[in-house]
Amino acid sequence: MNIDFIILAAGKGTRMGGDSPKVLADLAGRPMIQHLLDTVETFPKAKTSVIVGYKSKEVQESVICSKNISFINQKNQLGTAHAVKQALPALRNNSVSVVLYGDAPLVQKSTLNKLIKSALKGNLSLLTFIKEDPTGYGRIIRSSKNAVHKITEHKDASTSEKEIKEVNSGILAIKSSLLRELIPSIKNNNAAKEYYLTDLVEIANKNSVSVKATICDSYEVGGANDRQE
């Protein structure tokens, strides 16, 4: 089975302090993103596209990786879906695409395998986690059949939706052929004029693609927004 990983690593991460890219913050003596690269390299027949932007050369020179990992420069950071679009030409037709984040390096191989298994069934598969204080996170809104109906951002959530503790990690898996088909429908009709990957959920549902969620431990995907985290 072919797996095409897409790692989003273009941001600066101003709250990290300093001038280095966020994904190069130190974790156990190595750049954060290196831990993630080591994980994806354990998958046979996997290829990885790392989407870089801010100080892209520094990111590339700071990591150790095989020829199965390539770097793609996102010249303008126009949102997560725009970043994923940069990798579309590199995707194989018979593969599963897995979107990861360079600042969430602790996701486990076993967790990714569960996500990929779900995607192979034709689902858009999201990785979610339970957050006791979910302030600021997108809430997972499930249907009566327990499928994911939509993701509601905190600022848009109703009082009852804000009580939901299952939140979106951003990590997802989907057949590459489906990703190519659905992602052009994502528009930037929002205040920031950005293309949000979370819109893929609504688009998938409209196209009769089941959206499933796999819940993982929060430590795997909580991400890092400052050096303490």
What are these regions (language model features)?
Residues 3-7, 33, 47-50, 226:
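Hydrophobic targeting segments
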Residues 20-26, 186-189:
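Short glycine-enriched, charge-decorated loop/helix-capping segments at active-site entrances
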Residues 26, 106, 173, 223-224:
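Short aromatic/basic micro-patch
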Residues 31-114:
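Conserved N-terminal catalytic core of the sugar/cofactor nucleotidyltransferase
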Residues 192-229:
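Left-handed beta-helix
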